[in-house]
Amino acid sequence: SIGGNSHTDLHIYHCDNSLFLNLLEKNRSAYDYYIIMPHFKTEQMKHVSYTEEAVRAINKIPKDKLVIMDNNRIAIEDPFIEIFQDFENDIYGALQEGLSKIKKYSKLFLVYPENSVYPYPRRILYGFRKFCTEFALDYDILEEIYDDIILKKGDLFITIEESDLVNLVTQIREKEFSLGGDIGVISYNDTPLKELLGITCISTDFKKMGETAARMILDKSKGKVKNPFNFIDRDSL
């Protein structure tokens, strides 16, 4: 951590470009460091890494005060602190780690919400397709877990949103399939509750991301650091 003498404020902009710009302008000279996780959405609720206005606003921040976390698809040339996820290759690599268990299933489904309040990078989708194609696995893309979804023995689902995970596990139990036997489930991004419930996850290490940012701030160092992304094997696969 940065230490007990530091003070941190959290401002949430809900992937909204206008709100982000207003927050940044309002707090232009308020802080020693600006830690930004750049994820934006279009009017059609699609994910974009940045907007031209956001890049211009971020570029006004002195680079020795700038920390970009999570998403590094932003056009800033001068060196600064950058801890990022490689969304496409992260999911590809994590699924490859679990390949021996994944191959026992007949078909893979990625539940990727096309229109979400907090949209997800499409690079997740690209990495999943790349994995399935390379290892000749049958797959499909779903927008959500519907209440009347048809489940078959041998299906493996990868969910991103919590609501889809809850709906899926509920239906697996109601239809008397065995979780991790008849039907597999992998969830994107780990939480303590998923650990408690034995849900297999593929996840970046958010704690490590924060620790790396704190260390680089204290060391006054700059540079790009890829954050670890892990396959966490539990009972649902």
What are these regions (language model features)?
Residues 1-89, 93, 156-159, 163:
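Alpha-helical recognition/docking segments in bacterial nutrient-uptake
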Residues 151-237:
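Flexible loop/turn connectors
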Residues 50-56, 70-109, 203-222:
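Hydrophobic alpha-helical segments within soluble ligand-binding/sensing domains
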Residues 57-63, 102-103, 175-180:
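Short, conserved loop/helix-junction motifs that constitute active-site signature segments
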Residues 69-74, 142-146, 161-162, 186-192:
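Short, polar loop motifs at secondary-structure junctions
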Residues 66-67, 108, 185:
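Hydrophobic/aromatic residues located in beta-strands of well-ordered beta-sheets
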Residues 87-131, 225-237:
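An alpha-beta-alpha
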Residues 2-14, 108-111, 128-146, 155-156:
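Short beta-strand elements in bilobed, periplasmic/extracellular small-molecule ligand-binding domains
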